[in-house]
Amino acid sequence: MTQVNLGTANEFIARHIGPRAGDEQAMLNSLGFDSLEALSASVIPESIKGTSVLGLDDGLSEADALAMIKGIAGKNQLFKTYIGQGYYNCHTPSPILRNLLENPAWYTAYTPYQPEISQGRLEALLNFQTLISDLTGLPIANASLLDEATAAAEAMTFCKRLSKNKGSHQFFASIHSHTQTLDVLRTRAEPLGIDVVVGDERELTDVTPFFGALLQYPASNGDVFDYRELTERFHAANALVAVAADLLALTLLTPPGEFGADVAIGSAQRFGVPLGFGGPHAAYFSTKDAFKRDMPGRLVGVSVDRFGKPALRLAMQTREQHIRREKATSNICTAQVLLANIASMYAVYHGPKGLTQIANRVHHLTAILAKGLSALGVTVEQTSFFDTLTLATGAQTAALHDKARAQQINLRVIDAQRLGLSVDETTTQADIETLWGLFADGKTLPDFAALAAAAQSTIPASLVRQSPILSHPVFNRYHSETELMRYLRKLADKDLALDRTMIPLGSCTMKLNAASEMIPVTWAEFGALHPFAPAEQSAGYQQLTDELEAMLCAATGYDSISLQPNAGSQGEYAGLLAIRAYHQSRGEDRRDICLIPSSAHGTNPATANMAGMRVVVTACDARGNVDIEDLRAKAIEHREHLAALMITYPSTHGVFEEGIREICGIIHDNGGQVYIDGANMNAMVGLCAPGKFGGDVSHLNLHKTFCIPHGGGGPGVGPIGVKSHLTPFLPGHGHMERKEGAVCAAPFGSASILPITWMYIRMMGGAGLKRASQLAILNANYISRRLEEHYPVLYTGSNGLVAHECILDLRPLKDSSGISVDDVAKRLIDFGFHAPTMSFPVAGTLMIEPTESESKEELDRFCDAMIRIREEIRAVENGTLDKDDNPLKNAPHTAAELVGEWTHPYSREQAVYPVASLIEGKYWPPVGRVDNVFGDRNLVCACPSIESYA
């Protein structure tokens, strides 16, 4: 009888890994190796071999993993929640859930740096910006930030840069702000020497000490204040005013821009995004036109393509960290694009009337609730409110909380004498009557119908919104499910994501986001929990986070993990803050020098600056490695002030630097700590561990190495791992044992997407994770070897091998043919590919990272495209193709151009079908090459009129 494998362990590994066994061996043979172990042994430096401490179980099957995580999710208790405080239940419209959130065309896309293949999500983001601009009454809005609290911190530093009160280091923050926002403000302010003064704005007599102010609108306790006079006073004192505003409330309230606010920030969570135990959610940031060049975050703008037709792109990128480094407006790289797009489509689907109707329903239910509570003898502290009430409940407060929880209801905990209630989109008449029952104490409940008939708005007449909202046709057209479904399909068809093609972006790790990993994200057991719910209700999340932290410790060799940072940039920041606090705890406050190699990603110096450190750049040698002697000299020179080294490993040049242990030793010998940037961890899991070869702290990108999708530019998760001496300095939170050092609004950051990483690790197991790293290295070296005859590979290790990515040097081709790296990137679109990373870390190069998920067939398809492009460049070099009018200079080619008058000296077929395989399935870019200069010189960051597309 044939032996049958009755087990299901490790089944998923072959689903995640691209190359089949025969292909894998052929690729190894092309490199001169007979096994993955031999290749790994040759790539990994001797000094760090054997440092991996990965001791995980076998991988679970997809069915078993889903069953296990379903059991974990079931331990979370779903109470009816009225906690509010910036987080509200809402309904995610089913067509948005099915056609956007659960659609890989949307969630597997990358940040839209290549505009020609990103027009769909750029349009969705432009809708988001228009939504924010309309509701806040300010003309410029960005394409999202990480959460409301970090947006408030960005507003604070924004005010500091722009305020004319240059001698001031004090920032006023209203005591009516959400407490989690105040905590993050304090964290961000301290390293920058900013003093956050928290007070009651109604009692503020002297505003002259402040460079800026943050006001909450409506207030966290529910009050709606008129800030006009106060704003004028701040402006008279040369201070700027930021307003944290509730988007749904702004459909009914006078917008901040109309009462003089300089900045509006807040969260778009209640526009269709689940609570998710705190995230991910899209924050917003809008401001006056005069301040646009100092805005943080991405900004979508309208430009034109080479045919003069409207086209969208990311505008004013010179503000950002990848260009300005330590002088950037922010260190933020990943934002919250997927969540911003959900909020955008929520507004598109409901339109201005629908949003206003939801807001009016919420407000009137709150008014009915308040009237009923008053009739029951409960003191309601607010007379003007939108959706939130503070109740003076005195000695009964604790008993009322207990009574509510016994009925599976959460009320907001304020103090021993008061509690809070926030009504939301999901609240019903039955809910209001149940709430009355909590407070009735045997009294007859009020008559809902009678109170509803008499209910009136409590918003003061002076604050009732008069200006229209969302008048653009996009918000007034797609209100049936059929229309919205087709609109989302039309937008998705304009873009390239992993559902169509590999995305070989170096330093980005665009690997498979498996369907089984994604499924738990939409479960109510994970999505419907409030981040400030009592701990006993989140036992499932506690188990999930405990297990995930242990898994990540095993993968990295660190002793402790914090899952709070909600982006890689925030992980970097939290890591440097831990180092800073460690030095301070030892009485070494003077240590503020951060050494950073010249090859580092721009987030590194931008983050060091935010953490109050001075950046000293160290040199790299001709092979792309850190110049150890220059590093040693600078470490010794600054030994009394040395705080840290930030180094990426494997390096941003795509190689395992052989001197990494020596590098770490130099820093430690001179009193510093070593921050190993984990952006390239996909080459190390199961092979070597940064916590075991000299790292004191690293951040990980769960949206790279551990399979959380990029979402078109977010969400991301950037947890940090630390050695035990830094554990006391990990981020805290007001709802955790350690209160200090919060870097984002929620205790566990983007908690609701952590199941993705849990699923990936449990299904891959220890052997699968190691194999993934080995295949990532194999695929990169296979591409490097296939293309090295056509393009110089800029950096390799001493054995001629790369790590998990390779850099092709196109600079000689610019000299010989006039063809630029940009031309090659755009020509790849005609072949159906997203371009590799352009001009980073070296100008004029392409950095390619294929990941382990791509098959040999797909790798060959990409290599064939690159080789054919080299042939076209050669034709330009020898004069066969015109140096100005050729397929590369004119790429990408659109269908409209193909059927129009053809004036080029090369054929239509050469333009759009340069290889025969494209005939089977062709991606058509919706626009020609986008004019970046025009877009920045003629900045438009809201939906243009329909006529402009004519």
Swiss-Prot record:
Top-level taxon of origin: Bacteria
UniProt-listed InterPro entries: GcvP, GDC-P_C, GDC-P_N, GDC_P, PyrdxlP-dep_Trfase, PyrdxlP-dep_Trfase_major, PyrdxlP-dep_Trfase_small
Modified residues (N6-(pyridoxal phosphate)lysine): 704
Protein's UniProt keywords contain Disulfide bond: no
UniProt keyword annotation of Oxidoreductase present: yes
EC number annotated for this UniProt entry: 1.4.4.2
A GO molecular function held by the record: glycine binding
Enzyme class: oxidoreductase
Subunit comment: The glycine cleavage system is composed of four proteins: P, T, L and H.
Annotated family: Belongs to the GcvP family.
Protein name, entry field: Glycine dehydrogenase (decarboxylating) 1
Gene name of the record: gcvP1
